[in-house]
Amino acid sequence: MWQFPALLFLFLPGCCTAQDPVTGPEEVSGQEQGSLTVQCRYDSGWKDYKKYWCRGAYWKSCEILVETDASEQLVKENRVSIRDDQTDFIFTVTMEDLRMSDADIYWCGITKAGTDPMFKVNVNIDPEISTTIMTTTATVLPSTVLTSTVLTSTVLTPTTPTTESIGTENIGQVTQNSLFIWSLLSSISFLLMVFVVVPLLLSMLSAVLWVNRPQRHYGGGEIGLVETHRSDALDGEKHFPGDEK
């Protein structure tokens, strides 16, 4: 009573039994932009027949993508190639430059009169793994340019870099920024000395020289006193006639 269903099962395409003219993997996977290879094995009696690789869910209406010429010559159509090894009775199908749309049901087949021996293969395509490259950029504060002689007081608040935001390559940049700040402070100190300290010293020196300058005496009072004494002396030397008596 069960013999007829069992015999019918043996002739269904895609089943993996010893009586199948052609067999292969039931499922294969490939990665997007990559390639995959499918090996289909056949009985020695099918050595001189054409082998093919077709696509479609229904075996009777699948689209043949590539087919051999009954020899061992490699045949390639677009992104699919096939080669028949008639010594080991294996034909190999290679799909290159895989796309997500390539995921479908395919068939290993042998061309013959009547119904072709076929084997069903389910092809899965995995998405391409993208690699993200992380880059670290350092932000450099613009330099301050002094364009005027007017001095202004500037408060510099240094920021402490953290190890998370500054890597090994940024340490040199931080050192350069520190040297620039030190150079800027030195320039401000020099300008203070030139425009404040030096004029102040010159003013003090001028004041000292002014105080210690030589004093010239025009002596109006002294000259008058000398002249008075001289007049008295001359009057004493005069002789009057009454004095001789």
UniProtKB/Swiss-Prot annotation:
Ranges per topology, Extracellular: 19-189
Keywords: Cell membrane, Disulfide bond, Endosome, Immunity, Immunoglobulin domain, Lysosome, Membrane, Receptor, Signal, Transmembrane, Transmembrane helix
Sequence ranges assigned to domain Ig-like V-type in this UniProt record: 19-124
Region feature (Important for maintaining surface expression and for interaction with FCER1G): 177-182, 189-198
GO cellular component entries: early endosome; endosome; lysosome; plasma membrane
Membrane topology: Single-pass type I membrane protein
SUPFAM superfamilies: Immunoglobulin
Cytoplasmic side: 211-245
Inducing stimuli: Down-regulated in macrophages by single-stranded CpG oligodeoxynucleotide stimulation.
Tissue: Highly expressed in bone marrow-derived mast cells and macrophages, peripheral blood monocytes and CD11c+ cells, with weaker expression detected in CD11b cells in bone marrow and peripheral blood. Not detected in B220+ cells in bone marrow or spleen, in Thy-1.2+ or CD3+ cells in peripheral blood, spleen or thymus, or in NK1.1+ cells in spleen (at protein level). Widely expressed in various tissues including heart, liver, spleen, lung, kidney, brain, bone marrow, thymus, axillary lymph node and mesenteric lymph node.
Domain of life according to the entry: Eukaryota
Pfam families assigned to the protein according to its UniProt record, in alphabetical order: V-set
Segment forming the signal sequence: 1-18
Transmembrane segments annotated in the record for this chain: 190-210
SS bond partners: C40-C108
Biological-process GO terms, alphabetical: positive regulation of protein ubiquitination; positive regulation of toll-like receptor 9 signaling pathway; toll-like receptor 9 signaling pathway
Compartments in which it is found: Cell membrane; Early endosome; Lysosome
Subunit record text: Interacts with FCER1G; the interaction may be indirect. Interacts with TLR9.
Function according to Swiss-Prot or TrEMBL: Acts as an activating receptor inducing cytokine production in mast cells. Can act as a positive regulator of TLR9 signaling in macrophages, leading to enhanced production of pro-inflammatory cytokines.
Family: Belongs to the CD300 family.
Protein name (record): CMRF35-like molecule 3
Organism: Mus musculus (Mouse)
